[in-house]
Amino acid sequence: MKLQEKQTIHGFAVDRSRYVPELHSQAYELHHIQSGARLLYIQNDDDNKVFSISFRTTPSDSTGVPHICEHSTLCGSRKFPLKEPFVELVKGSLNTFLNAMTFPDKTMYPVASRNAADFKNLMDVYLDAVFFPNMIKDKQVLMQEGWHYHLDSADSELTYRGVVYNEMKGVFSSPDSQMERHVMDALFPDTTYGVESGGNPDDIPSLTQESFAAFHAKYYHPSNSYLFLYGDMDIDQTLAFIDGEYLSQFHVQSVDSAIGRQTCPGSQVKTYPYGIATGEKTDHKTLHSLTYVIDDALDPTVAMAFKVLTYVLLQSPAAPLKKALVDAGLGKDISGDFQDGILQPLWGISVNGSDPDKQAQILPLVRKVLSDMVRSGLDKTLLTGALNRTEFALREADFVGRPKGLIYGIRCMDTWLYDMDPLAALSYEGALETLRRGIDNGYFEGLIQKYILDNPYYALVSLVPEPGLTERHDKALADKLAAYKASLSKEEIDAIVADSQALQKRQATPDSPEALETIPTLTRDDLEKKVDSIAMEQQTMDGVTVCYVPDETNGITYVNAYFDLHGLTREEISYVYLLSDLIGDMDTTDHTYGDIASLIDLYTGGIDYSVSAFSNRTDNKDYMPVFRFKAKGLTQNLDKLVDLLKEISLHTVFTNKDRLAELVEETKAGWDMDAFRRGHTIVMHRVLSYVSPVEAFCDAGELSYYQFITDIAGRIRSDADEIGAKLSAVMKKIFTRSALTLEVTASQEDWKTAKVVVPAWIQALPQGEKPQGLCDFGLSRKNEGIMTSGTVQYVAKGGNFRSHGYDYDGSLMVLDTILQYGYLWTKIRVQGGAYGAFTRFYDNGDMVFCSYRDPNLRSSVEAYDALADYLESFDVSDREMTKYVIGTLSRIDVPLTPSLRGAKAMSRYFTGTTEAIAQQRRDQLLATMAADIRALAPRIRAVMEDDNVCVMGSEAKIREAKDLFANLVSLPD
């Protein structure tokens, strides 16, 4: 059905209709006459349908009320009176996306599904949640999702608990997050951007139930809403449903959600402390941020221009401003960022791995370098390459498994929220044309002059490390709570105990069957029985296996090279991981690293380098370690892409000592900033490395790599020749024809070109010897407590069930869903207050449980240990079991882009997973019943009794539970 301008349909007026060539879609702007709701519909033939409803939410304090509201609306509503309908949807729908998101000035609720009935169910639950949530009258929702005083008994220690409270404690454990908050405080003292929409842990306990309910009443009205629809759907039925079930129950009202524009408060220069561990060194751990407010960047052309400039000046390996800052010794890790999606966008420079005395030198150097560039002109080759890179990404529209409509729905809010054309943020042809012309007419230089050099609206903020600060803050909080408890009467203490116990009882009580049945669900008959088939042709070119995956790729060819890493020593494995961080950013015999970067940007869609491993399906001692080149480009430029792959793999040199040192030190500084944020990944691989050779190999790129790069960074200035020689040696050892397997994803027509062009790389590689043997990592149970200055934990426990004689089958995929959104969700998130927990079960028998931003430690380990008991008595209705099966399929059957299809095909290839094996797994999954889940209890019990534990988190918490660990260690210093 096509809509017509000026048409009225189901209470909606069609205000405007336009074709959007960039999306190959027809776009309709509508408004709901009675309620005032706005609606944008992007009509096309994409079966991955998307719906979202967003609200402009402008908090006036840092209690996190928008964030807590986002969590809480999905905790039961008028039509769906369950404790957490969101969880029921996750485990019982065919969604391809399901989440909610809090931004500085808006809250979004998007869903996606390829199944029409499922899509309608998702819309129904989400619309009821945002307009009629139980959180308004049920104070236990705020207690659970936001915060509450917690007392187990009158004699116990008074604490704060709450999911968002602990989530934000984890967020603010990262210096980067602290820096972002300080920058926004400095730049926006008088507007909503000057407060933390996610919530500051120090302020969250100030939120009252009355303020919470009032916030929802004010902002969650259709007159303040933005509805978005995308894809192939019956729009007549969809609009009728939205109107009849929801919007017709409201009338237009005035909602004061305006975002005030901050007038320039003058330039700001500020310094703040951040916590590091007691006794930790402070050298090179200061962060600086120079950030400018770019008021006119709501213009999509200006916004795109600043993204191009950010890459040219600060992100490209050839970036001149980054080089100037590094050469001046101001920092080890330099990066840049353009932040749109707010009324007054920001352009910023981050200088990490620095010291406090460097602050005064940053602004003068930046101004000098940029002034010189404006005077002499920016490098046109760099600009052209950066713009080509931007254009390639826009046209490819590969969002790494996320639905296209989801990304478009978020992007359109970049203008729509500020009362501008929503399609302006989705159209890019005009901006590309303007910027192409701008390379030669001084456009970019003019932007630098106007928005940076002549702009007084900036903040220079520094974060200086202070050992023991976190511990002192935690003690002050404990003292504050103890003093508050001491001020309470017996009746008041008893009331807190009663409230705490009542909440725990609610959390432990399952929803009634009647409540569960309010959530519509599909049946097993509705489910796709056949496994996704990925066609792959194999042939041999010059002795190398080449796998071809046919797909429609819009003129793009994807080339993936996998070099076998058998035969490496333990030291060589560390150097291979280092090589993946450096290669492509170093000189070659024919080009400087800057020239290489420019050629990649000019002629390709990017080349990435990584190290990974594919495990044997039935034996974790046997695996395929690989170094991967992941490259893509327009087929018309495939010859240039292959030339670059050939040059980088064969002719990279490590003789530029300064460049080598800069990259090593930048890598180390990056780990210093990111290690805690990726704590769940670190502990997951680390705990499995105690028992699994393949995971020991992966850990060589995680915590072990952080330890390695710390050592290398400490001696790179003196030992550059030795380190460079080892990198060269390992590069020559691994990049051989005998070690190579190639994969190409392209259309049939483009494959003809690839078959002619790609052999040039194969033929250039030395033959080499077939790699043999795997490294002996000397596995042992270390049970480490990794102590940090963070205030939350990442708690992992795992092992291998095949070592106990158990096999893998498809029911374990269903168990994953049951645990993540049942047992662990309740125990770790709902009752424990962690942000989340997840499980992993692998074909080779490796399995792990891990919590994320967890305020607890011992109780989470105890929850893992009690899991087998839970499974032994697991008993749910057939309807509930079917929901778990459906939810499992929704995670497996995600729509694949061409690049993801190629990657999935190669995963099956390297692990020996034939289509027949994949079909067997699916059949087992689809047939899983409660009895099959109970039968898994012995293998879980066996692995938990192996007692492999690894935790990263608060030093105090880890020391309190030191009996759980054989080793207490700190992150590298």
Locations of the language-model features?
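Extended, regular secondary-structure scaffolds
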Residues: A214, Y226, I235-Q253, S376, ...
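Hydrophobic, small-residue-rich alpha-helical packing segments that form membrane-like cores
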Residues: S153-N224, F228-Y246, F250-A277, T282-H284, ...
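His/Glu-based metal-binding/catalytic segments typifying zinc-dependent metallopeptidases
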Residues: Q43-D45, S52-S54, Y165, K169, ...
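Active-site His/Glu-centered metal-binding helix of metallohydrolases
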Residues: V65, C69-T73, L579
